[in-house]
């Protein structure tokens, strides 16, 4: 399998197992996506934006543990991002009234404004990115990644 790294430059991965190639490709893709998204969002990074998206998925203010689980990363990584986002007034960390050991994460008005300002431009970027992928290909890719994700969770 040949992979184009730049105009006129290709690397041949024919001797590499496809599973290893896929994991490398996913990492390379996420690195490129992160660079693009970091340039798009001025005040916060793509990973911080992803954290805000994950928090917003919950109906009630989630805990650090819940957000860490949905993001697939450590409590320490999430906590560091939350500290920065709290300083920038995107989130508030509040003690859970029913369990003082837990902290609940609440989105602020600044986050709501951020979402309103960035929803349409973000959708345009996603439309442009996925313009070369049809619906069936996208569904197959999603299902494959979901299977791999479930397997990773079993391997913990």
Enumerate the language-model features and the residues they cover:
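N-terminal leader segment of winged-helix/HTH proteins
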Residues: 1-42
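C-terminal regulatory/oligomerization modules of transcriptional regulators
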Residues: 1-14, 136-156
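N-terminal helix-turn-helix DNA-binding core of bacterial DNA-binding proteins
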Residues: 34-74
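N-terminal positioning helix adjacent to the helix-turn-helix/winged-helix DNA-binding module
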Residues: 18, 44-48, 110, 137
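Alpha-helical linker/hinge and terminal dimerization helices associated
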Residues: 26-29, 33-37, 114, 118-133, ...
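Hydrophobic structural patches
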Residues: 26, 52-55, 145
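Charged, amphipathic alpha-helical coiled-coil/dimerization segments
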Residues: 4, 83-142
């Amino acid at each position: 399998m040949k992979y184009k790294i730049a105009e006129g430059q290709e690397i041949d991965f024919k001797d590499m197992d496809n599973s290893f190639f896929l994991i490398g490709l996913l990492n390379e893709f996420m690195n490129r996506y992160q660079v693009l998204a970091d340039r798009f969002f001025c005040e916060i990074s793509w990973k911080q934006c992803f954290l805000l998206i994950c928090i917003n998925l919950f109906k009630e203010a989630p805990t650090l543990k819940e957000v860490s689980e949905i993001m697939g990363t450590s409590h320490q990584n999430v906590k560091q991002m939350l500290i920065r986002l709290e300083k920038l007034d995107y989130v508030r960390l509040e003690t859970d009234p029913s369990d003082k050991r837990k902290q609940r994460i609440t989105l602020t008005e600044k986050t709501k404004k951020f979402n309103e300002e960035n929803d349409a431009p973000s959708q345009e970027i996603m439309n442009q990115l996925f313009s070369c992928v049809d619906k069936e290909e996208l569904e197959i890719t999603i299902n494959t990644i979901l299977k791999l994700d479930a397997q990773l969770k079993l391997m913990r």
